[in-house]
Amino acid sequence: MVINFAAGPAKLPEEVLKEVQENLVNCNGSGISVMEMSHRSSNYAKIHDATISDLRELLNVPSNYKILLMQGGGTGQFAAVALNLIGKTGTADYVITGSWSAKAAKEAAQYGTVNAVLPKLAKYTTVPRQETWKLDPNASYVYYCDNETVEGVEFDFVPEVPAGVPLVADMSSNFLSRPFDVSKFGVIYAGAQKNIGPAGTTVIIVRDDLIGKHLKITPSILNFEQMDKNNSLLNTPPTFGIYVMGLVFKWIKRNGGVAGMAKLAAAKSKLIYDTINQSNGFYYCPVDVNVRSRMNVPFRIGSASGDDALEKEFLSKAEAEGMIQLKGHRSVGGIRASLYNAVTLAETQQLANLMLAFYKNNKN
């Protein structure tokens, strides 16, 4: 058996994969695969609309928010957010706490003035407290990344922003892993390939008063107004990905909803962080305790800077036991265990057991 700890594209629930397998050739009795369905057909419309409806239910999305299903991933939204929102004042505030928020700020700077509200961090291992932020009350929006996948930094609070300034969150890697109040945000987006489906679809939740404020140069494919007017069917959507995502939403509903996912995430991440904390420094996680991600757990082995030989040996032993894709991001090295919604508690326990055994065999 293989246990997939990939950072994305990531593990999908086995139940969902089996359902996809059963319906692959003949989807819902239609006689054809969902991959062959016209996106304008009634068969596909049922899938598309149910996916949006189930997401609205899972997050209690208020009626004045639109749900869009777009393409281009998170990187596409780095541009789309700026193109659709920055025109209000020409400036935007960016809270840069990791690789992805840094990339988003760089992209947005092509379309307006970006204000970095934090001093440049030497290392992405913390979220400075809000009282140190330099927010501009004239900003078109405030942008942050709720969970930095590479560095394993996850916000433990929702930022407070100046009155009238919309809050924008990239939730690509922790979407549907904990409840949150949608009404605190102007825009929320998430690439599907971490927690909610295969790569290719990006979910956008946008407050309706922010639609229609785009720059003239905004391409139709990134235009929130165009996508909203066309029910996300402006062009051919990633129909198969949306179908699978819809099945994941139903799986979440069957398994305690978003609150159920949050409970599971807390239990799984505690297993790994407890193992790290009880290893007398053999395992080392550089991230401040209060913002350690429940989704992505990065750590070094042997010391704070890592022992290359030990880390290679650990990865080899993990693979021999069926645990794959544990290598850390190339920019930070070490090990990274991604514990998205589909990863089970039992699978996480197997990783914790391996870590404990490896520690006992290799500690000085």
UniProtKB/Swiss-Prot annotation:
* EC identifiers of the protein: 2.6.1.52
InterPro entries registered for this protein in UniProt? Aminotrans_V_dom (IPR000192), Aminotrans_V_PyrdxlP_BS (IPR020578), Pser_aminoTfrase (IPR022278), PyrdxlP-dep_Trfase (IPR015424), PyrdxlP-dep_Trfase_major (IPR015421), PyrdxlP-dep_Trfase_small (IPR015422)
Q: Which residues carry this modification: N6-(pyridoxal phosphate)lysine?
A: K194
Q: In which pathway does it act?
A: Amino-acid biosynthesis; L-serine biosynthesis; L-serine from 3-phospho-D-glycerate: step 2/3; Cofactor biosynthesis; pyridoxine 5'-phosphate biosynthesis; pyridoxine 5'-phosphate from D-erythrose 4-phosphate: step 3/5
Q: Where does pyridoxal 5'-phosphate bind?
A: G74, T75, W100, T149, D170, Q193, N235, T236
| Pfam families linked | Aminotran_5 (PF00266)
Keyword Transferase annotated: yes
Q: What cellular-component terms does GO give this entry? A: cytoplasm; cytosol
According to its UniProt record, which cofactors does this protein need?
pyridoxal 5'-phosphate
User: Which residues hold L-glutamate?
Assistant: R40
Q: Supply the alphabetized keyword list.
A: Amino-acid biosynthesis, Aminotransferase, Pyridoxal phosphate, Serine biosynthesis, Transferase
Name the tissues where it is expressed.
Expressed in ovary and head.
Protein name, entry field: Phosphoserine aminotransferase
Q: Name one GO molecular function term.
A: O-phospho-L-serine:2-oxoglutarate aminotransferase activity
- What does the note under cofactor report? Binds 1 pyridoxal phosphate per subunit.
Q: Which reaction does it catalyse?
A: O-phospho-L-serine + 2-oxoglutarate = 3-phosphooxypyruvate + L-glutamate; 4-(phosphooxy)-L-threonine + 2-oxoglutarate = (R)-3-hydroxy-2-oxo-4-phosphooxybutanoate + L-glutamate
Give the family this protein belongs to, as stated in its UniProt record: Belongs to the class-V pyridoxal-phosphate-dependent aminotransferase family. SerC subfamily.
Task: Name any Gene Ontology BP term.
Answer: L-serine biosynthetic process
Q: What does this protein do?
A: Catalyzes the reversible conversion of 3-phosphohydroxypyruvate to phosphoserine and of 3-hydroxy-2-oxo-4-phosphonooxybutanoate to phosphohydroxythreonine.
